[in-house]
Amino acid sequence: MRSDAIKKGHLRAPNRSLLRACGLKDEDFDKPFIGVANSYIDIIPGHYFLNDYAKIIKDEIRKNGCVPFEFNTIGVDDGIAMGHEGMLYSLPSRELIANSIETVMNAHQLDALICIPNCDKITPGMLMGALRVNVPTIFVSGGPMASGVTKKGEKISLSSVFEAVGAYESKKISEEEFKDIECSACPSGGSCSGMFTANSMNTLCEAMGIALEGNGTILALSKEREELLRKAARRICEIALDERFKIRNIITQKAVRNAMVVDMAMGGSSNTVLHMLAISREAGVALDIKDLNFISSKVAHIAKIAPSLNSVYMDDIHKAGGVSAVMAEISSRQGHILELDALTITGESLKERLKNAKIKDENIIRKVDNAYSKVGGLAILFGNLAKQGCVIKTAGIIGERKFKGKAVCFNSQDEAIKGIIKGKVQKGNVCVIRYEGPKGGPGMQEMLSPTSLLMGMGLGADVALITDGRFSGATRGLSVGHISPEAAEGGLIGLLKDGDEIEIDVDAYTIHANVSEEEIAKRKKEFALPQKEVSSRWLRMYQKLVSNASKGAVLDME
């Protein structure tokens, strides 16, 4: 056992003495030691109950002949951190989470790992850390919350509240309606109910085979979710000493491809691109941002979920057959794009896992022949504005897929929010938000507040927004993020001026500023990078080491 390094032989008597202080007995030193990586925190609705989940898991591990050791990671709630300086810390928290998993697991030489994530950067951070450790690993998330319901009987989610701010600012709804939306949107514990980043990543864990069926869609705080916890705990005990189930044997090139196929079929958050690039790097798997358009071109978009379609939420997807039904439909009609021989954590191949899966409601999960789109729900655009690429969630587009407009430029998200409220962005404009990339922020803030304001003010179909920052999974509209190179590293987005004409063609995968090469060269000569004081030592360190978005915004020591 790996854990023999801390528990076997007379030289380890001091180690055992400390472990006895934690309650271990003689017989425990012959059992596998399993790390239970929790992410319990009171301030995140998807995490405040995870201490109870960890107890269920630990009890089941003990019943099955292993010794659990619970430890915790930090967590940041993107919705609560949104719209102020707190959002600077969201993406960097992913690296701290990865480091904490690696640190605890390797410092104590634990044999296997079960991770309990749920929201935002916590799932990808845990995946990155687990891949560094490379022991048998299972992920079992906290689960999504149910959708909210207003007094009028309308189904809503957190994204509805952000959009209501814009509607209230432009006097489209009353104060009473505004308060009703605020109080109804998040009715229970769990990750936010739409296909936002949390549910996207928990769904992709299922697609990669590192989580059991239902991980992405079974509601939080349900009996069904509790049974999933017990199944995961039993399974980690079965495989704790089996090297076939080391996480790098599960998250392979094939698994990563399957994840991106499901991402395209379900119109996942644009953040998944950032995270899968980082996860692939830790797994030693090749994934280039340029590859994603090929996958998208081969995969139909068959499940549309809020915020892209506000009548469908994660619990609806679960009732309709879940992630397995999506994969089964893709495999039956577009099977060549899925790697069906990929190994899953149960020991089955993906093909075996899907043998009984089927769509139970074709109004929720469509057949390929009746897909929302013949291509996937994400796209990578290239052009003089994004020579290294940028990302758009095509599933969330509500207007034209071609757009030409005049730039209205802002040098920060705060500046953009004030400008939008004051009416500086009008129909036909391209709202440009820059110096919000991984280095420029630093931290690559999400632009949910600006996009939601535009939607709520009735401009969602008539305005494009481009940024070197990123978007919440709750964003919809013609929103282009992750522009690389970013403004802070000399990207053209930093040289744009108000009135410059910008063209976006989603189907041609292009984004272009109609500015001559001569004019660009002139602007470069005159350009001086705006100086932004960063008081936080952690953010300064992050700024110095972080790569750009086209590489996953990872800390790069090379």
Curated annotation (Swiss-Prot):
* Annotated EC: 4.2.1.9
Positions in coiled-coil regions: none
Name a Pfam family for this protein. Answer: ILV_EDD_C
Which reactions is this enzyme annotated as catalysing? (2R)-2,3-dihydroxy-3-methylbutanoate = 3-methyl-2-oxobutanoate + H2O; (2R,3R)-2,3-dihydroxy-3-methylpentanoate = (S)-3-methyl-2-oxopentanoate + H2O
Keyword annotations from UniProtKB, A to Z: 2Fe-2S, Amino-acid biosynthesis, Branched-chain amino acid biosynthesis, Iron, Iron-sulfur, Lyase, Magnesium, Metal-binding
Show the InterPro entries listed in the entry. Dihydro-acid_dehy_C, DihydroxyA_deHydtase, DiOHA_6PGluconate_deHydtase_CS, ILV_EDD_C, ILV_EDD_N, IlvD/EDD_N
GO biological process terms held by the UniProt record: isoleucine biosynthetic process; L-valine biosynthetic process
**For [2Fe-2S] cluster, which residues are the binding ones?**
C119, C192
- Needed cofactors: [2Fe-2S] cluster; Mg(2+)
UniProt GO cellular component terms = cytosol
- Give the pathway: Amino-acid biosynthesis; L-isoleucine biosynthesis; L-isoleucine from 2-oxobutanoate: step 3/4; Amino-acid biosynthesis; L-valine biosynthesis; L-valine from pyruvate: step 3/4
| GO molecular function terms listed in the Swiss-Prot or TrEMBL record | 2 iron, 2 sulfur cluster binding; dihydroxy-acid dehydratase activity; magnesium ion binding
Top-tier EC class: lyase
| Spans traversing the lipid bilayer | none
Entry-annotated residues carrying N6-carboxylysine: K121
Q: Which Gene3D superfamilies match?
A: IlvD/EDD C-terminal domain-like
Report residues binding Mg(2+). D78, D120, K121, E446
PANTHER family, A to Z = D-XYLONATE DEHYDRATASE (PTHR43661), D-XYLONATE DEHYDRATASE YAGF-RELATED (PTHR43661:SF3)
Question: Per its UniProt record, what NCBIfam families does this chain match?
Answer: ilvD (TIGR00110), PRK00911.1 (NF002068)
Question: What's this protein's function?
Answer: Functions in the biosynthesis of branched-chain amino acids. Catalyzes the dehydration of (2R,3R)-2,3-dihydroxy-3-methylpentanoate (2,3-dihydroxy-3-methylvalerate) into 2-oxo-3-methylpentanoate (2-oxo-3-methylvalerate) and of (2R)-2,3-dihydroxy-3-methylbutanoate (2,3-dihydroxyisovalerate) into 2-oxo-3-methylbutanoate (2-oxoisovalerate), the penultimate precursor to L-isoleucine and L-valine, respectively.
In the record, the note on similarity to other proteins reads: Belongs to the IlvD/Edd family.
Subunit comment? Homodimer.
Q: What is this protein called?
A: Dihydroxy-acid dehydratase
Its encoding gene is what? ilvD
